[in-house]
């Protein structure tokens, strides 16, 4: 499959210093303009305020980082009810760039939450239609090739939705 070939090409691709917050902004901008033309009325909000204007540099392949963000946003959108918001937060956590994506959808099934990154595992209720389940597995592989990690959780408290956290080493 194309995505698996992409994965192999990443290990050979040239990595460079990239401002992750910039990549997030441009991907979200594209998604928001597409969402304006959809009838679900979903808005993606980015919160970079914790960065205080400093760059969120990581060592990576820009097209792959875009692919990760797009894939995670795609998932969030497909699980989101109409008239809801998706929150994207960029932050610094210890020595990592932190990217959090939270939606207001049904959230993860708690007992299968550690399986969501497995290949071919799909957490989708039937009404979301067919899905290969490859998405999160490939996202995880690309993130790990960048020296990072990804975790899934349900936001604490009685908030609905799913929360994905990506950590990538900060590149000085």
Positions of predicted regions on the chain:
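Short conserved segments within the C-terminal catalytic ATPase subdomain
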Residues: 34-49
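Short beta-strand/loop element within the Bergerat-fold HATPase_c
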Residues: 83-95
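Conserved micro-motifs of the catalytic ATP-binding
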Residues: 8-13, 53-60
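Short conserved segment of the HATPase_c
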Residues: 108-120
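Short helix-loop "hinge" at the ATP-lid/N-box region of the Bergerat-fold HATPase_c
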Residues: 76-77
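Conserved glycine-rich
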Residues: 148-149
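Acidic ATP/Mg2+-coordinating residue in the GHKL
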Residues: 103
């Amino acid at each position: 499959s194309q995505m698996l070939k992409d994965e192999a090409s990443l290990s050979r691709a040239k990595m460079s210093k990239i401002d992750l917050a910039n990549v997030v902004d441009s991907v979200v901008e594209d998604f928001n303009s597409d969402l304006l033309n959809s009838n679900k009325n979903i808005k993606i909000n980015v919160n970079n305020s914790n960065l205080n204007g400093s760059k969120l540099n990581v060592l990576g392949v820009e097209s792959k980082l875009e692919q990760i963000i797009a894939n995670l946003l795609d998932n969030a959108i497909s699980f989101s009810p109409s008239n809801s918001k998706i929150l994207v937060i960029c932050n610094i956590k210890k020595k990592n760039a932190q990217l959090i994506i939270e939606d207001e959808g049904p959230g993860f099934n708690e007992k299968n939450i550690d399986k969501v990154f497995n290949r071919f595992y799909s957490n989708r209720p039937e009404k979301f239609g067919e899905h290969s389940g490859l998405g999160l597995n490939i996202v995880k592989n690309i993130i790990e090739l960048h020296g990072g990690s990804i975790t899934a959780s349900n936001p604490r408290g009685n908030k609905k939705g799913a929360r994905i956290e990506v950590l990538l080493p900060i590149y000085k």
